[in-house]
Amino acid sequence: MQAGADAVGGRILTRAANPACPVRRCQLLDATYHVLRSQLEHLLDPDEADPWPRHHQHFGASLAVTAAGYRQVGGLPAVPYLEDEALFRALRRHDLRVRHSPQVRVYTSDRQQGRVAVGLSWQLREWAGLLQHGHEPLVDHPAQLISHWQTRRRLRELWRTTQAGAPVATQAAGLAAVGPVAAALLVPPPDLWRQVRQSASFGELWEWVEAQRQAQLASHGPWPHLPLRAAVALLRQEIARLMPAAT
C-alpha cells in the first residue's frame, strides 16, 4: 500500500495435502487456470496498478483496504455471502487501485465443511461432487476472454476520450464511435453511448456493461464453456503467441 494501492489481495494457499487426491489436483488445476487468465488479461488490457506478476484472489483475510478507500466505497456491502467479492466490485466501481500481490500469502484449511454458505469449503465440495460423477469443471473459453478484454480496453479508451472533453459533433457521430464496441459487447449503441457520457468512473460504466451482457451471453454467447484442462492448454497457447519472441 505504500506504493499507492488502495487495496491489496494476497494469495490464498492451503496446507500441504495429498497430491494424489482428485479434489486437490482439481484445486491446483483451477489455480493454474486463473493465474494464466490473469497473465493473459495483463497482456491484453494491462492495469498499471496491478502489473504482472499477479494473481486472481482478493478474499477474506487476504484482502486489505485503506481506511480512505473503505470509506469511499461505503464500507462492507450488506450481502448474505461473498461480501469480500462484493467489496472488490465496489472498489472497481470507484476505479480504486487494487493490487493482487504474489508477495502476500495466507494459509487456510482445505476442509469441506466451512463456516459460511459460499466459500472455499463450498467450492471444494462442488469439485468433489463433479469428480465423483466423472465430470470435469467447465470454465470460460479463452476466446471469449480475449474478446472481453480487448473490447474492455477499447471501451476504456473511448470513455477516457469522452471524459477529457473531446468534442462529438452530433448524436450520430457518438453512436458511430461506440458502434463497433457495442456490437462486440452485445449491448444497444444508444444505451452504451449514454452510459459512456454519464458514468463518473470507468468501473461504473463497465459494471453496467457486465450487467447488460450477462443475459445476452447466456442466450447468444458464441463460445461454449470448456473443460478445465482444455482451457488451461488453450490459455498457454494464447500466452505463448502474445509474449515477445525473445521470451
Residue map of PLM features:
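Hydrophobic residues within well-ordered alpha-helices
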Residues: 90-92, 97
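Short, flexible, basic/aromatic active-site loop/helix in glycosyltransferases
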Residues: 27-55
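Acidic donor-binding loop at a coil-to-helix junction in glycosyltransferase catalytic cores
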Residues: 81-87, 101
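Conserved nucleotide-sugar donor-binding
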Residues: 43, 57-74
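Active-site donor/metal-binding and catalytic loop motifs
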Residues: 102-118
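Terminal low-complexity segments of carbohydrate-biosynthetic enzymes
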Residues: 129-247
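Conserved donor NDP-sugar-binding/catalytic core segment of glycosyltransferases
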Residues: 1-28
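A residue-level structural signature of the nucleotidyltransferase/glycosyltransferase Rossmann-like core
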Residues: 62, 80, 98-99
